Every structure is written in structure tokens, then in C-alpha cells.
Amino acid sequence: MVKKIHFIMERHASIVAFLLAVLALTESQAFTSVKLPRDEHWPYNYVSIGPAGVWAVNRQNKLFYRTGTYGDNANMGSGWQFKQDGVGQVDVGKDKVGYINLSGGSLFRIDGISQGNPVGGSPKSWEWWTKYIGMSLREDTRFSSRIENQNKVLTFTFRTCFWASRITNWCFADSSYTETVTAGGSGTWITKSQLKYKSGTFGNPDTEGGDWITVDSGSFQHVSSGSGVVLAVRSNGELVKRTGITCSLPQGSGWTSMLNGMSRVDTYGTVAWAVDTYGDLYFINL
């Protein structure tokens, strides 16, 4: 009888272990991706998704809005509407889009985006000497972040700071070499070859937070913070998803590999968009 009980317990334990392994494997592979057909605007350099829809920049530095994606992040859209020439990088916020002017390194903002006018009004000059913009997903753009031309992270806050011999609301958040910055539901993250998370920003990225925590000392080229998810692109082009992210461990504990040959990624809600090294676009259901 004792042997029989032990056998049953061992059998149940092995079944449970098997089911847990299957569940873990399923979770690690629980995404689907669609590679968009090449169109007349191909190849692309950047893509961004947010409340104001999907926007992309091609290698001719033209900025486009993806038709049918405003307020509907799960929609892949059906075509592109041209918006602006001479654009280097774009990031989507809430009814606003920020982009970098390629020639002058100046930051511009497109306001007035709505369901009835998804491409918004005329671009407005916002700031000088900018190489990267991370827009706030709130209506208030003062919670956005940017990287200036000396590779330093600045956050747009309510405080007034003295910077570059003039008064501004852009305040230093990190003083060393930075490549990309992102702010979303999983907090504020940056790539500095290494990957770093700003403590105290999980669930509320619109705060200045605390110290920077090195999450991975490996080499990364891009990162995107979403709601409970962080996606990143390693320098070798591998798109990875951060695992183990919780309120008590916001920097997570590991990685799951997703796709190879990528250069950029952006996530919002339950989906993500990515660009590969050939300039092809990918729509990803997470």
C-alpha cells in the first residue's frame, strides 16, 4: 500500500512538472507575428505605436501614419498616409506625435490628432539639439523624455532647470552616454549599450524615479516599455521579451527570444511593431 501511494504521488508530481513545463513553453512562445508585404514606401527605418496609432519613417526619411490604427492598437491598418519629409525618428504619444528633424536635429510635435483627423495639424517646433524622443502616453507632454545631442537623457518636468545657458523645463535624468529611451507601463528604460531600468517608475513612468538599475550588461540597441511587458533588441538583432516582471521585481528576471534580424521595436497594449535590418515591418500579437 505504501509503495502504491508513493507511486501515485510520484506519477502526479511528474504530471504536474510536465504541465508546468508545457505552460512555461507556451508562455514563452505565446506570440504571433506577421511580416507586412513590401510597398512603394519600403524600406523603413523606424516604427512607433501608441494611442495616436502607428507611425513609421522610411529610409527616404518620410513620415507616415498607418491608416485605421488611431485608437485601435490591435488593428494592423490598411495603408499609409504621408505626413512629413526630412524625419529621422518618431515616437507616438496620446493624440500627439513627436519627431526629430533629420537635417537640424530639432524636435517637432504634431498636435490635434483625433479620430476625425488622425494625422493632426501642422508640426510645431518644440526643442533644439535632440537626437531621440520618447513621448509620454498621457495628454500632458511634460512627462516626455528626450536624448540631446551630447547623448544625455532629459525629462520634461514641472521644474525649471538651467541647461545649455538657458532656462528650460528639460532636466537631466542621466548624464552619461545614452542611445534610446522609453517610458511606458513597465517604467522607464534606456539603452547605453547596456540595458537599464529607472527604479520607482514601474506602473507610473511619468515620475523622475530613483537610481538607474543595470538590468543586463549585454549589448542592446533598442528597448520599448509597455503595459507589463518590455521588449528589446540586442546588438546582434535578436528581439527578446523580458520575463518575470512584477511589482516587486519590476526589472524582471530573464529573457525569451522572439525574432531575429530586428533593428527597432515598439509596443503598446497587446501588440508590438518591429523593423528588421532589411527595412521590413512586422506586426506582433503578444
From Swiss-Prot:
Q: A GO molecular function for this record?
A: carbohydrate binding
> PTM comment for this protein?
Glycosylated. PV2 contains four O-linked and one N-linked oligosaccharide bonds. The protein contains 2.5% of carbohydrates (high levels of mannose, galactose, and NAcGlucosamine, and small amounts of NacGalactosamine). PV2 is a very high density lipoprotein (VHDL). It contains 3.75% of lipids. The major lipid classes are free sterols and phospholipids and also have significant quantities of energy-providing triacylglycerides and free fatty acids.
The keyword Repressor belongs to this UniProt entry's keyword annotation = no
Q: Which Gene Ontology cellular-component terms appear in the entry?
A: extracellular region; membrane; other organism cell membrane
Q: Which subcellular locations apply to this protein?
A: Secreted; Target cell membrane
Q: Which residues are glycosylated?
A: 101
Output the Pfam families linked to this UniProt entry: Tectonin (PF19193)
Q: Which InterPro entries match?
A: Beta-propeller_rpt_TECPR (IPR006624), Tectonin_beta-propeller (IPR051513)
Alphabetized UniProt keyword annotations: Disulfide bond, Enterotoxin, Glycoprotein, Hemagglutinin, Lectin, Lipoprotein, Membrane, Neurotoxin, Secreted, Signal, Storage protein, Target cell membrane, Target membrane, Toxin
Establish whether keyword Kinase is in the entry. no
Which residues belong to the signal peptide in this entry? 1-30
Q: Which family does it belong to?
A: Belongs to the tectonin family.
Q: Report the function annotation for this chain.
A: The egg defensive protein perivitellin-2 is a pore-forming two-subunit glycoprotein that affects both the nervous and digestive systems of mammals. In addition, it is a source of both structural and energetic molecules during embryonic development. The tachylectin subunit (31 kDa) binds target membranes while the MACPF subunit (67 kDa) disrupts lipid bilayers forming large pores altering the plasma membrance conductance. Both in vivo and in vitro, the protein shows wide pH range stability and is resistant to enzymatic proteolysis from gastrointestinal environments.
Q: Kindly provide the name given to this protein in its UniProt entry.
A: Perivitellin-2 31 kDa subunit
Q: Which species does the entry assign this protein to?
A: Pomacea canaliculata (Golden apple snail)
